[in-house]
Amino acid sequence: MQTISLSTHLEASQQVAWDVISDHSLYGSFTGTSQVTLEKQGTPHTNGVGAIRVFHVGPIRIREEITTFEPPKQMAYRVLSLPLPLRNCRSDLLLVPCEDGGSCILHWDSWFELAIPFTGGVLRRVVAAQLNKIVAGIAVEVALRAGSAS
C-alpha cells in the first residue's frame, strides 16, 4: 500500500475551507480538469455520502464516490475508475481549526495499491505531484473566498 500525506495551512475559517473542499462544482477551477460533474447525488447533502463525482480531463474520466461527509471537518472518497494502474485508491480530507479561529489546517491522506509491480516510485511521484497541485489550488480558492467574505 502506498501512502501520500499532505498538510497545508489555509488562510480561512474551517467553514470557508469546508465550503470549498465539499463542493464538487468548484474542483474544475483548481484540479486542472476541464469540468467536474455530479453523476449521482449524495445523502443527505448533494455532495454527501454516496455522491459520485466525475472529473473530465479531455477524453479521460475519473470517477470518485464520497464515503465520509462530516461538515465542516471531514470528507473521504474512494476512486471508482482511474486511467492509471492503481487499485483501491482512497483519500481522507480533514480540516482542523487553528486557535485563531480565522484559519485552519487541511490534512490530506491518500492510499493506493499498485496494479503493476515495481511502479511504485514513478506512480507515487505522479500522484503526489497532482495532489500537491490540487492542495495549492484549494489554498488559493479558500483565500479568495475568505477575502471576499470580509
Kindly give the residue locations of the regions a language model identified.
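Hydrophobic ligand-binding cavity/cleft-lining segments
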Residues: 1-42, 150
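A generic structural signal for beta-strand entry/edge sites
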Residues: 1-3, 72-74, 101-105
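Short, surface-exposed coil-to-beta transition loops
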Residues: 3-5, 60-64, 87-91
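Generic structural detector for well-ordered beta-strands
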Residues: 7-11, 54-56, 65, 94
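Short strand-connecting beta-turns/loops that link adjacent beta-strands
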Residues: 13, 60, 71-72, 98-101
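Glycine-rich portal/gate segments that line the openings of hydrophobic small-molecule binding cavities
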Residues: 29, 38-83, 133, 137-150
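Beta-strand/loop substructures that line and gate deep hydrophobic ligand-binding cavities in soluble
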Residues: 81-133, 140, 149
